[in-house]
């Protein structure tokens, strides 16, 4: 998974004990003994995520990414995946697309290697996250594909947090529910701005309970059977003085156990 909320590249290792960590048996494993480009590093690595912690050690090898090939990339070989969460996720490893400031063990980020190799048309990347799922979503390296957007981009400067430039952190001017401002971005330590992290590694909207409570109250209840989905208000985020609407279908999670089961909805 390509995760803008973290900055390390790691893959599950063939050295993972499947009897102790069953999740390793559910994924493709990297075996460095089969690589002629592998170089040992050996430094221990621990990677904390909101979904769980995994650990292992650093290694070096050639990274092939789309049609790019980059030698001597330092990455994590994970041989410990405790907990059920790693068994349930559909991906094998994580490619951190965050800034260097949050990289564990201060290793270079995967995208930093691409920039240093001067292989890109521009030092940018973009995501198109499709409502139809992963099969139709796109990561573009070195720019943005015009087939996936209309109009002009709104450019926003990244912000630091406690002096650390690690997350894709931007300032939000306001949050409106059904066109009404609730003053959610007032009274923050950063002034009258909401600091927001753009994180492709999570599919939910999160925030401080105190700030979210009036927002949730204004949205109202979501029927578990999804029957009132189309009556819910838009959430409008204001960035750089421009409004961006989020329709209910994009902030309500619809899920069902199988094709024969009814849809169930909840805020997300």
Where on the chain are the PLM-derived regions?
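Aspartyl protease catalytic domain
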Residues: 62-190, 257-268
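Aspartic protease catalytic domain
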Residues: 2, 74-81, 129-133, 190-192, ...
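Signature of the N-terminal lobe/flap region of pepsin-like aspartyl proteases
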Residues: 1-82, 86, 90, 218, ...
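Aspartyl protease active-site motif detector
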Residues: 1-31, 63, 94-98, 141, ...
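Soluble non-cytosolic domains of exported or imported proteins
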Residues: 53-57, 101, 105, 206
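Generic preference for well-ordered alpha-helical elements
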Residues: 56, 107-108, 168, 209-212
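Short linear motifs in intrinsically disordered
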Residues: 35, 49-55, 116-117, 163-164, ...
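Charged, amphipathic alpha-helical segments
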Residues: 42-48, 106-116, 213-225
């Amino acid at each position: 998974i390509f995760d803008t909320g973290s900055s390390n590249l790691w893959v599950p290792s063939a050295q993972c004990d499947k009897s102790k960590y069953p999740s390793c048996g559910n994924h493709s494993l990297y075996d460095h003994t089969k690589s002629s480009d592998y170089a040992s590093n050996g430094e221990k690595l621990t990677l904390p995520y909101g979904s769980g912690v995994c650990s292992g050690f650093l290694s070096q090898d050639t990274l092939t990414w789309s049609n790019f090939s980059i030698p001597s990339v330092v990455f994590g070989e994970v041989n410990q995946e405790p907990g059920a969460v790693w068994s349930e996720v559909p991906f094998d490893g994580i490619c951190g697309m965050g800034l260097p400031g949050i990289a564990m063990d201060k290793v270079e980020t995967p995208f930093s290697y691409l920039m240093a190799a001067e292989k890109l048309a521009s030092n940018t990347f973009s995501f198109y996250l499709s409502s139809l799922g992963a099969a139709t979503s796109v990561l573009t390296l070195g720019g943005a594909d015009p087939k996936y957007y209309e109009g002009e981009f709104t450019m926003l400067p990244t912000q630091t947090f406690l002096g650390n430039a690690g997350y894709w952190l931007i300032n939000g001017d306001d949050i409106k529910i059904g066109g009404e401002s609730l003053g959610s971005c007032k009274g923050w330590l950063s002034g009258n701005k909401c600091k927001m992290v753009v994180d492709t590694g999570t599919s939910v909207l999160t925030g401080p309970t105190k700030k979210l409570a009036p927002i949730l109250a204004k949205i109202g209840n979501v029927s578990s059977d999804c029957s009132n989905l189309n009556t819910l208000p838009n959430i409008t985020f204001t960035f750089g003085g421009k409004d961006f609407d989020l329709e209910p279908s994009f902030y309500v999670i619809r899920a069902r156990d199988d094709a024969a089961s009814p849809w169930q909805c909840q805020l997300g």
